Amino acid sequence: MEEKIINKIMTGSHDLNKWLEGGYEKDIITLFYGPAASGKSNFIMLAACHEAKKDKKVIFIDTEGSFSIDRINQITGGIPEFVLKNIIILKPTNYQEQKEAFFKLLNELKSENIGLIVVDSITMLYRLELADARAKGIEEVRRVNFDLAKQMKALYETARKREIPVLITSQVYNEFLSEEDWLSGKQPGVEMVGGDLLRYWSKCIIELQNKNGKKKAIIRKHRSLPEKEFNFEIVNEGIRRRGLF
């Protein structure tokens, strides 16, 4: 049990720590994907606050404007200043700026006190860039995908070599149904933006769902844990297990 604690960071939630048997692994990328309002940003904000409160530096690449001082104030119980001074925020607004943010990230890694890297989300600006690239041809599409692969590789190597945990999020879209499937009443499944590219580099993948206001996390990929579910609710202090009712 001691080895697990050493090789993981706490999630910031007691219930979530129990579900993940100790927290997030240090030497990998952990990926959260799900629709809007499913809790993706809350999972990573909670972990960021927990590390920052330990006086560890957190690099937070915010492409969606999800970083909220008010939310940090709730999570920390009204003492955000100490936490905020330990969070390095980068806010790219287009795909080129996102690529530049990764160069800044690598420079910040010269510090010996980095406890966590967060990207929320890694696919929003990619998705916009990809839409433009498709109008220009296959070579542009390849370029955009190659750039994302380079970013994921940089995160993966950082996690592996420096044992700095990396948490990222991705958006989702409904899969395309054929006319035959649609007429048969088949419901479209949910696909992750970034697909196989993100799956390849991420060693822990957690799907988040929000159905009729009831939120659920599902482990879809993990090195040591089976696929399992965690019903949860978001509260001021963070995340806690939801009861049966």
Q: Where are the regions that the model predicts?
A:
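P-loop NTPase motor core
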Residues: 104-197
